[in-house]
Amino acid sequence: MSHLGYEIKKLGFGLMRLPKRGDNIDVEQVKVMVDRFLADGFTYFDTAWAYPGSEDAIRQALVERHPREAFQLATKNAAWIKCKSREEAIGQFETSLRQTGAGYFDFYLLHNLGESRTRFFDVFNMWDFVQEKKRQGLIRHVGFSFHSTPEELEQILSAHPEMEFVQLQINYGDWENPAVQSRACYEVARRHEKPVIIMEPVKGGMLATPPEPVVKIFRKANPQASNASWAIRFAASLEGVITVLSGMSNVAQMQDNLSYMKDNLSYMRNFAPLSAEEHTTIQEAQKALNSIPLIPCTTCNYCAKVCPNDIGISGSFIAMNYLTLYKDKRAARVQEQWLVGGHGRQSADKCVQCGVCEAVCPQHIAIRDELVRVHAALGDGQLAPGS
C-alpha cells in the first residue's frame, strides 16, 4: 500500500541497536545486513542524531554504497537533549546531514515528543524550522515520534495538523498496557488520518524471548514461527501502517525477520494480515504475558543520557527481569556485572534518587523504586528509598 507517495514494504531497519565489535559499531557486519535487506526488497532505514555512531555507520554501509533513490532514510531531532538554544537544536539537523551524507532525508522526525520534552520543540520553534527545510528540499516528509498519553497526542496533532505521520510504540505486550496505551495512541493517530510508523514491535527484544508460557502458546499454534515474527506480524497487520521498525543487531536476527517478510516463501512480502485464529493466539499470549510482573524497559537508554551518576539502569533492569523469569540469581548477577560494571556504569546502589531519569523514560517506569528493588535482590545490601 502506498503512503506519502512511497511504496514501502512492512519491515523497516531500525538502526538503534547495531552490532558492536568491542566498543564500536561493526560497520562490516552492518554492510552485510544492509545489502541483504535491500536485496530482499526492503528500503526503509531509521536512525537518529541521538543514536551514538549510527548515522556515521549508515553513511558507510548504505549511503556511500547504494544509489540514493534506492532507499528511504529517516533520522530524528532530539532538541531536549542538551540544547540550550534554537541554534543548538538546528545544529542537530546539520550534524545529521553531515554524518549521514544523505543530501536530504525522506522522513525527518521530532524525536520522542511528550511530557516536558515537547516544550523544547515549541520554545525553539522547530515546527517552523522543519517546514522550512521541507520547502528547501532537504526534508521530504515531516513527523514525530511519541511516547506519552493519547490525550497529549490528541493535543499535538490538533495543534500541528501539518505533521504528516506519527511514529508510535506498538506491540502486543503494550496494546492495553496502561503505562504505554499503544491501542489508544494508535486510534488517535488514525482519527487524525495520520499514517503510522511502528517502533518497538518486539519491545526492545523482550518479545523475542518471552516467558515460557507465551512460548508454549506460539509453539502450539505454529511450531515453525519464531517468537519475534508473531510480534512483528501483529504490528504490521494494523491499518494505516507505513512500516514496522525492527532493531536488528546481527545478521541472524535479520535473517529471521526477512524469512517472515519475504514473498510467498513465507508470510510478508505480499503481506497478509493475521488471521482470526492467529489473533486469538496473540490474545492468549497477551493474557499470559500480563500475568508476569516484568520491568517494561526497552533499553532505549534515554535515562542514561541524563543520569548524573551514570547508573547502569537498563542493564540493571535486564538482570532483574532475568531473575523474575528464570529464578536464577547467580546468572542474573553475572548479567548485572557485565551489563553494568562491564560497560563502565555504576550499580543501582549509587542512585541518589534525583528522579531526572523518570522524566525522560518513554515507558513511564518508576526507575528509582525499581533500582531499590534491583539492589535488594541482586546487590550486597539494602538501598533505602529516598536516600
Predicted regions: what they are:
Residues 69-82, 108-111:
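A short, structured active-site edge motif that brings together acidic residues
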Residues 1-71, 129, 135:
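N-terminal binding-site loop/beta-alpha segment at the start of enzyme catalytic domains
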Residues 39, 88-109, 131-136:
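CE4/NodB-like, metal-dependent polysaccharide N-deacetylase domain
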Residues 16-28, 76-88, 116-119, 214-225:
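Active-site mouth loops of central-metabolism enzymes
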Residues 54-64, 85-97, 101, 118-128, ...:
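Distinct, well-ordered alpha-helical segments
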Residues 113-298, 302-311, 315-318, 325-336, ...:
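Beta/alpha (TIM)-barrel catalytic core signal, keyed to glycine-rich beta->alpha loops juxtaposed to Asp/Glu
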Residues 6-11, 41-44, 67-71, 101-106, ...:
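Short, well-ordered coil/turn segments that N-cap beta-strands
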Residues 382-387:
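Short, basic, low-complexity termini and linkers enriched in Ser/Thr/Gly/Pro
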